[in-house]
Amino acid sequence: MHSRQQEIAVALHVCAPFTGPESVQTEIERRIRFIQSCLRESGMKTLVLGISGGVDSTTAGLLAQRAVEGMRAAGEGDHYRFIAVRLPYQVQHDEHEAQLAVDTIKPDECHTVNIGTAVLGLAAATEALEPLSPEQRDFVLGNTKARMRMVAQYTIANARQGLVIGTDHAAEAVMGFFTKFGDGACDLTPLAGLVKDQVRQIAAALGAPEQLVHKVPTADLEELSPGKPDEAAHGVSYRNIDDFLQGKPVPDEAAQIIVDTYDKTAHKRQLPKEP
């Protein structure tokens, strides 16, 4: 066991391993209640979430839809609604899976905002991009795509008295695998503390198709590396990340990659610094 496993797990509020179907269901209910309490406390009426077709957004969407349906069924008001948002950049290569996710969630509403024009317009107007290599430019615009998607979600939320849901969980948080003020910007994170396999278990328990539950995770932000798996970007598998966070034995090399990346990305998990 690496000397920092417990420290990092505590900092990220890692959820205890599930012990069976009952514990999965208990966690589902707890997180639905959390979403409902966020709506009540904020005074907002809707939940807004971008649906990519991956297991994380599918799971968060299923929890959100159940949360608002529960509030309506309890007589708290028909105004509580979940708005799913499709956010393709021009043509989405996994369009079928994104649509499958929407069909699975059955959101109250589904909007589509193609961010291509906005991203390319900003790129054309930004002189700082001109001296960059193709690889550097691709990386920068990848982060711009993530930020533009969050702009779109907050625009809808602002118009509809809504809260924006984030899909961050412990296995991504430890690696800083999100864009600062992009997909890392949100009002609530109902998957927080879960490791990747727990997200999959919850998705399966909520009825997500096997195709989405076990889809290879990819941020798919860089055009020069389309469909690049998260694990290729991490340099370590989600199995190793999950085991590390749950205090299980992990190969020394994998553990060191996780710790080094956690330290390097600390700024992403902190509020802006003050004097």
UniProtKB/Swiss-Prot annotation:
Coiled coil feature spans: none
GO CC term, one of those recorded: cytoplasm
Gene Ontology MF term list: ATP binding; glutaminase activity; metal ion binding; NAD+ synthase (glutamine-hydrolyzing) activity; NAD+ synthase activity
Main enzyme class: ligase
One Pfam family it belongs to: NAD_synthase
Reaction(s) the record says it catalyses: deamido-NAD(+) + NH4(+) + ATP = AMP + diphosphate + NAD(+) + H(+)
Binding residues for deamido-NAD(+): 147, 180, 187, 267-268
Functional summary from the UniProt entry: Catalyzes the ATP-dependent amidation of deamido-NAD to form NAD. Uses ammonia as a nitrogen source.
Oligomer status and interactors: Homodimer.
Protein name, entry field: NH(3)-dependent NAD(+) synthetase
Lineage of the organism: Bacteria, Pseudomonadati, Pseudomonadota, Gammaproteobacteria, Pseudomonadales
